């Protein structure tokens, strides 16, 4: 029963793009940044689907994460591999995005969450 309720709550966070917000869009959460898609939250959500054997939702989420975020912004990862540590905030792979995988407008911050990128790559490579 608890697992089913948890899955229902997770489904409320699902975006039409297949990505997952940190909280449901209609949750009334006061802190608006939690209404965004975070790489880390999406990966942990996908790992939850894997743990209950929901391969369809797992597959859809993996494709969304790859297509909408990681491949879309891969040039930033490529740049980092070749050039090293970014000099400007905009050069980092950001930790959060809009529901469609685009950047949050006006947010040129470089909050590094390399662990989230590493977690995503680890999970995708399993």
Residue ranges of model-derived segments:
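Acidic, mature catalytic/reactive cores of soluble proteins
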Residues: 1-126
């Amino acid at each position: 029963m608890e697992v089913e309720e948890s899955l229902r709550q997770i489904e409320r966070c699902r975006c039409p793009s297949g990505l997952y917000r940190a909280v449901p869009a209609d949750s009334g959460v006061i802190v608006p940044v939690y209404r965004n898609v975070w790489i880390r939250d999406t990966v942990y959500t996908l790992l939850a689907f894997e743990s209950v054997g929901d391969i369809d939702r797992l597959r859809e989420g993996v494709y969304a994460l790859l297509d909408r975020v990681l491949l879309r912004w891969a040039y930033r990862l490529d740049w980092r591999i070749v050039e090293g540590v970014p000099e400007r905030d905009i050069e980092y792979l950001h930790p959060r995005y809009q529901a469609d995988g685009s950047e949050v407008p006006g947010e040129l911050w470089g909050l590094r969450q390399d662990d989230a990128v590493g977690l995503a790559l680890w999970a995708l490579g399993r």
